[in-house]
From Swiss-Prot:
GO terms for cellular component: ribonuclease P complex. This is Ribonuclease P protein component. Consists of a catalytic RNA component (M1 or rnpB) and a protein subunit. Keywords: Endonuclease, Hydrolase, Nuclease, RNA-binding, tRNA processing. HAMAP family: RNase_P. The keyword Amino-acid biosynthesis does not apply.
Length: 120
């Protein structure tokens, strides 16, 4: 597989993994998204996504958002330190176009990488 793939070892899979991040997280916040991160012991960054039905009503919008988040992460994973990241969707996220969402995520990945480098 290519180095920009999104394989199983790049995902947060269990509730325990998510709780680990939520307990002591470094945030990067925008009006529509919150990224929470915490250093991990694995050799690469890992991603978890939560987009609640309460925040984004339609399933096809939630799926579109998750696809875009995964693709953006896949493209930026080489520039991220070894951290576990949870992306939390907020209300109004479904109103963003794909391009706007990519732009917001790009800024948040950079912000998160800087904050995690400082806190290390």
């Amino acid at each position: 597989m290519g180095e920009n793939s999104f394989s199983r070892e790049l995902r947060l899979l269990t509730p325990t993994h998510f709780e680990f991040v939520f307990k002591n997280a470094t945030p990067a916040v925008s009006p529509n998204l919150t990224l929470l991160a915490r250093h991990n012991d694995s050799p690469n960054p890992r991603l978890g996504i939560t987009v609640a039905k309460k925040r984004v009503k339609k399933a096809h919008d939630r799926n579109r958002i998750k696809r875009i988040v995964r693709e953006s992460f896949r493209n930026h994973q080489q520039s991220l330190p070894n951290i576990d990241i949870v992306v939390v969707g907020k209300s109004g996220l479904d109103k963003l176009s794909n391009q706007e969402l990519f732009l917001v995520l790009s800024k948040l990945w950079k912000k998160l990488a800087k904050r995690c480098e400082k806190s290390q």
